[in-house]
């Protein structure tokens, strides 16, 4: 019997002939089931989709479609799918923010029964103990796993050594935001197509919000005090909002608010940007064969002011709870393959630069000699080891989260905040207006959500 995997990017379908692998308990000839997998269009997910087309063998009678979707669209579509009980997608890709909330709402399947149903050999080969604890634990509710980490990330500074040398500049290992701004202004040369510093500018709680919330934390800001009073209208918050705008307006890319991480990566790869603050998982594409600055990228710890700009995230795979048991087992088989030690080792065999290798998901990844030798490996580990997940900023807060606030409402209010941030950056509204609107929104959310 023939089985087919289709890799779908937007509207493009690629059919690939595959054969079968048995799940615990054996397999039997059955009617074909169709599994739809949703991935974000970030470099490592695209690499996974490409590799799956040639390397992954689904169970017998399984036809897998992989859809690679722009990140903001993916978040919206999967949130709608999960909250309404839809079954368009069988495998969801998300982060710890969604994992915790969706598991509580019953929007994710508990993975423990699926692990229990594996053969002893398959369980041993997967080696759950090798998953980095902080990453695996962020995907659990009451001790049970509801997702598996594909790759993890913190954040750091990436910079173009050539542009620094040409301008006689030195990057401190632990710079402040003010130091970064001055360095970016010194490099910025729009007449010659050189951008001082690039960052995400496109609105979205997981887009521009990802660097912005850690920036607020670094300036000593917080979003709620311990009594759930909104704390947006403070000098610390205002300083962060102003710094974000100053960097992008005075030393950043053109068309600021269209930039996701994909555009920022491309700009850095071209050699036309000096500094980039973003996820540690973005380093591999900068060191890839397609990058003009491969081998010429410097790395520094995330910027700080009163506090450090902390970031902890992972992209993880979970299962739609509304599908059949056979569909769940088929999805789980793909998840096990894509998060396995064998998959990681294979990515290094295919691309020894590490550009396609998922970072910060497994401890064993850093024992692969070729991976341990890549220029960003050690500093990634160092940054992860210094994270303090329970203390995102200077003063205590009633919520968790380093680049997000772990309450269900944040997907909406965080996205609205970043829209007002974008409006402020491009000059459509004043800082006072942006701060006032965000303060009122967060205060109203605390009351309506029953937090106070």
Region roles according to the model:
Residues 31-42, 62-67, 90-91, 197:
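Short, well-ordered beta-strand elements
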């Amino acid at each position: 019997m023939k089985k087919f995997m289709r890799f779908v990017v937007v509207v493009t379908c690629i059919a690939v002939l595959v054969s079968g692998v048995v799940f615990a308990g054996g397999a039997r000839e059955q009617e074909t089931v169709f599994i739809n997998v949703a991935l974000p269009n970030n470099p490592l997910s695209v690499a996974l989709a490409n590799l799956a087309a040639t390397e992954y063998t689904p169970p017998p009678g399984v036809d897998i479609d992989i859809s690679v979707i722009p990140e903001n669209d993916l978040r919206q579509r999967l949130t709608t799918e999960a909250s309404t009980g839809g079954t368009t997608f069988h495998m969801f890709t998300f982060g710890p923010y969604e994992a915790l909330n969706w598991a509580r709402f019953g929007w994710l399947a508990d993975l423990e029964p699926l692990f229990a149903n594996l053969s002893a050999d398959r369980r041993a080969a997967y080696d759950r103990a090798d998953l980095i604890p902080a990453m695996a634990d962020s995907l659990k509710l009451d001790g049970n796993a509801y997702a598996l980490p594909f790759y993890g990330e913190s954040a750091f500074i990436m910079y173009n050594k050539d542009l620094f040398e040409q301008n006689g500049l030195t990057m401190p290992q632990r710079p402040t935001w003010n130091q970064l701004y001055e360095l970016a202004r010194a490099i910025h040369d729009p007449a010659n197509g050189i951008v001082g510093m690039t960052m995400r500018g496109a609105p979205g709680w997981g887009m521009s919000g990802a660097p912005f919330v850690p920036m607020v934390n670094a300036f000593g800001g917080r979003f709620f005090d311990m009594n759930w009073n909104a704390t947006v209208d403070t000098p610390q918050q205002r300083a962060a909002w102003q710094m974000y705008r100053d960097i992008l307006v005075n030393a950043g890319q053109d068309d600021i608010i269209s930039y996701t991480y994909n555009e920022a990566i491309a700009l850095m790869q071209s050699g036309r940007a000096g500094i980039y603050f973003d996820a540690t998982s973005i380093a591999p594409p900068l060191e890839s064969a397609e990058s003009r600055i491969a081998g010429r990228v410097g790395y520094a710890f995330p910027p700080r002011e009163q506090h450090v700009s902390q970031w902890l995230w992972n992209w993880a795979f979970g299962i739609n709870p509304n599908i059949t048991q056979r569909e769940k087992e088929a999805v789980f088989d793909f998840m096990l393959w894509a998060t396995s030690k064998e998959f990681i080792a294979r990515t290094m065999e295919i691309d020894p630069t590490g550009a396609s290798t998922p970072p910060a998901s497994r401890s064993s990844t850093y024992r692969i000699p070729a991976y341990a030798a890549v220029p960003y490996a050690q500093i990634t580990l160092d940054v992860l080891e210094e994270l303090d997940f329970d203390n995102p900023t200077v003063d205590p807060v009633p919520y968790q989260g380093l680049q997000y606030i772990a309450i269900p409402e944040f997907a909406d209010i965080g996205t609205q905040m970043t829209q007002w941030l974008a409006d402020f950056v491009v000059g459509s509204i004043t800082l006072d207006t942006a701060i006032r609107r965000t303060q009122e929104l967060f205060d109203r959310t605390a009351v309506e959500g029953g937090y106070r």
